[in-house]
Regions:
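Short, flexible loop/hinge motifs at secondary-structure junctions
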Residues: 1-169, 240-241, 269-273, 303
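Catalytic center-proximal scaffold of phosphoryl-transfer enzymes
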Residues: 28, 50, 64, 69, ...
Length: 526
């Protein structure tokens, strides 16, 4: 009797724990969905929200795993009793498996006789189908292209078709394999040594030097497309520019190099030109690099306040001065850090006082962002009209308020620095009031550099300056494909298979936006 009571108590406790874990997981799931929906509807107002979403997703993973563990414990405990029913967890509904997935039908053999009376007179009433998602391990194959030799009995001439084309000299790899190697290295940030190890576990011995040989040859083969994308980007009316660090090995030591990006995206002001991202690498951050990169560009450059761009804004520039526009998200971030109540609370004893001025500045800047969300994607003229009517009064009030607060504050006040940063560059911050093409933020360029931030964690450094150049060139291709909603690996595979045989005049057909249209046309025709 005591054992039965103990089993019941244990089962009840297990059910309670499973119920609690399930509730926590469900709450976390719903909070995450709400946060994602708010982000889609209202846009991203701060980097902190992006980080918060990542933290919520990680927390949800742990809670889901814990809830499943507790549910299984409750099932086992309930099975040892006759009075306790096992806890049944309420899970968020799962999406059905996509229709395009291959279905393998396995029919369980029908019974030959009735298990109740033994009769063989059975008739089928219907069927129930249980679907199980499974993965097929990657398949490798060797394609043997047979070239038969023939001789002419009249003139004894020997004939044989030419050898099949390979993308790379001394080539042995097909375009799909090459595309996978390139995308995993430059799109998924998997170094060649890790790829080589994984292939070896799958029974394929491809050394790092062999893979590197293929990568170098593919980069050379794809250079013409990189040149076309470069020309397309630099022909833009407005560019987003930014840079980030990348460690580069150089003669036994590591130097802090830079990756520069210039993003063309006309969609916010209703432009129809395809978006594209251009990358360059350098061993330092000297001003000569952006000057060289943008020597053929004339238009608007949205960037940070890096002094290396100043030569581009010089009215005496031979190609014509580039118009500077600064990023409001960058300015807002400086105020937000002084007004972040949650972050301040986490500092505990080291917390600094929340700045009321910074908090007020964030609210005033957010009012401008609210207007921008409503005009995103409208024409240049319509955006300018709304800004003149709605944003201009707010901007004038913000400038007057900042100047008044700046005159009151001590130079040592923490909030004085971001105010001074804005006021000394006010004409560049106010550029969006004069031109509907200007965006309020430089987020397009910052997003384009996130891959390199992730890459630094994976591959730590670029192996050489040429390696950094190669990474910049390949990332140009991959990111441009992504910006046009094109699968980079599928695109690279098709391009590598065709690029050697296509005339120079038709190379633009292989650009991601033209390629996507061609694939869609083929799909419709089929």
């Amino acid at each position: 009797m005591a054992e039965a009571d103990a089993a019941v108590a244990k089962a009840e406790a297990a059910n309670a724990q499973a119920d609690l874990s399930s509730s926590e997981a469900l709450i976390a799931h719903l909070k995450l969905e709400i946060a994602k929906l708010r982000r889609e509807i209202y846009g991203t107002r701060s980097e902190r929200k992006a980080r918060l979403l990542e933290q919520m997703e990680l927390r949800l993973e742990d809670l889901e795993a814990a809830a499943t563990e507790d549910e299984l414990v409750a099932e086992k405990a309930a099975a040892r009793t006759q009075t306790i029913q096992s806890f049944q967890r309420k899970r968020p509904s799962r999406k059905p498996f996509p229709d395009h997935l291959l279905r393998e039908r396995i029919v369980i053999a029908a019974p030959e006789s009735c298990p109740c009376c033994g009769s063989a007179k059975l008739s089928k009433l219907g069927e129930d189908i249980t679907e199980t998602l499974e993965v097929i391990p990657r398949q490798w194959k060797v394609i043997q292209t047979v070239r038969e030799k023939f001789s002419c009995r009249e003139c004894e001439k020997i004939m044989q078709p030419p050898a099949p084309f390979h993308v790379t000299p001394r080539g042995f790899a097909g375009p799909n394999l090459l595309a996978m190697i390139l995308f995993e290295k430059f799109g998924q940030h998997q170094p060649l040594n890790r790829q080589s190890e994984r292939y070896r576990r799958e029974g394929i011995d491809l050394s790092v030097s062999t893979l590197a040989d293929q990568v170098g040859a593919c980069t050379t083969a794809l250079r013409p497309l990189h040149a076309l994308i470069e020309r397309h980007v630099l022909a833009a009316e407005r560019l987003h520019g930014d840079d980030t660090t990348v460690p580069i090995l150089a003669k036994g030591k590591t130097v802090t190099g830079r990756i520069w990006t210039y993003v063309r995206d006309d969609r916010p002001f209703g432009g129809h030109a395809p978006p594209a991202a251009l990358y360059y690498a350098s061993r330092d951050r000297k001003h000569e690099h952006p000057v060289q990169h943008l020597q053929a560009f004339t238009g608007i450059l949205q960037a940070d306040a890096y002094s290396g761009y100043n030569e581009l804004y010089d009215p005496s520039r031979s190609q014509g001065a580039i118009t500077a526009a600064l990023c409001w998200a960058h300015a807002r971030r400086q105020f937000f850090e002084l007004a972040d109540i949650a972050a301040n609370a986490r500092r505990g004893k080291n917390a600094a006082a929340i700045s009321p001025v910074a908090l007020a500045a964030v609210k005033r800047i957010d009012a401008l962002f609210d207007i921008e969300r409503d005009i995103n994607g409208l024409s240049t003229e319509e955006r300018l009209r709304v800004r003149q009517e709605q944003s201009a009064p707010l901007l004038a009030a913000l400038e007057a308020w900042l100047r008044e607060e700046h005159s009151r504050l001590s130079r040592s006040a923490s909030v004085a620095q971001p105010i001074d940063y804005m006021l000394r560059r006010w004409d560049r911050f106010a550029r969006f009031i004069e031109d509907g093409r200007v965006c309020l933020t430089n987020n397009a360029a910052e997003r384009a550099l996130r891959g390199f931030a992730l890459g630094r964690k994976s591959w730590l450094f670029a192996g050489s300056e040429r390696g950094a150049d190669r990474a910049a060139a390949m990332t140009t291709l991959i990111m441009t494909a992504k910006l046009n909603d094109v699968d980079p690996q599928a695109w690279l595979a098709d391009v590598l298979a065709r690029i050697a045989n296509i005339p120079q005049s038709r190379l633009p057909e292989l650009l991601p936006w033209h390629w996507a249209a061609e694939m869609e046309h083929r799909k419709v025709a089929a």
